[in-house]
Every structure is written in C-alpha cells, then in structure tokens.
Amino acid sequence: MVHSEPIIRDNDFYGFIEVVDRPKLSVVICMVKHDDYMTPFSAWEDVSAYIPRHLTLWEAFYGDGTSGAHLTELGFDVIHEDVDFFEHDLGECVVTNPPFSELPRVLARLRELGKPFVVIMPCSTLTTRYFRDLFPDIQVIVPRRRIQFRKLVDGEEVPSGRCSFDCLYFCWRLGLPRDVVFSTRWPFLPSRQK
C-alpha cells in the first residue's frame, strides 16, 4: 500500500512523505524543497572582478532583496525586482542564485534568453544531462571557500549551520580567461563579512 501525506515540520521545509508498506518493511521517502537560502555579500564579492561592469545585471530571483543590494554595493548597475523570472526578460546579464529545486526550468529559461550569466549552483549540476545538453560551452569559477548561505523561514533569518555541499559560479558568454577559474581575493576590494 502506498499513500502520501502533506507535511510541514517547524516551518523549515515542505513536501510530502510517501509511506510504502511491505511485509516486515516500511520505507519512508521524504521529498523536500529547501529554496529559501540567500546569497551572502562575500559570495558576490569573491567573483565581482569577473562580472562585466559595462552591462546592466539582472538579479533574477528576489529572495529577501539583499542579493541585488550586495551587487549594487559592489558598484554594479542592477535590476532586482520581485518579478517572475519565467515571465520577464530584464537586464543584459543574469547574475543570480536560483532556487535549486527549479534548476532544469531555470537553465532552460537561461538558454532561451541567450544572455550572458553568472549563476550559483551546486557542483553536481555539472554532471547532469540536462545541463550538459543546454550548455556544453560553460565556464566555471571555483570559489575560494564553500559559500555559507543565509537561511530564511517565513522571512526571518534562522541559524542554518554550515553548508554541506559545494557550489560553483557557472558562467556563460562572459569570455573568462580560462574555462575553470579559481577565485582569489582581489586587492582592490575591501573585505567585508555580511
């Protein structure tokens, strides 16, 4: 027997639990979405030297609004509005941290837009067929350290512990000096924790 029940636990996630009953065996499968993780200032600071300053950036996923503010603080011209990425086409270069549960849709939309982009995604994205088929000519920037995202629950920041996976900056049509670039601290950027 298989049945699904909606679940909400501690406002930390949503999804469903599927319970499969078998003789002497009960298996629980949990489908969870964790998309409310915000980009810290340091994540954009680390790659700001590679983001084109002559283009208007579109921070396409609004979140709590701070990511666009961080990019503006770093000196970029940024469009950061709370609009649907799948229905709008803004700016000249997409710079964003999309909801990871929506990556296939996000990547298809990025390909459709045809704009240069810098997108933070898990390293494992590189090994997926849908990604390879859409962007065989991708370039990546490897961060100096693991990105520690800020977790929001109902609009409030909550302690989230250390991030358990690595992310890369996936870049398309930026003309980076190499296909794999290792990020370093740039001397002309002030270091700031946020």
What are the residue ranges of the model-derived segments?
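Class I S-adenosyl-L-methionine-dependent methyltransferase catalytic core
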Residues: 1-194
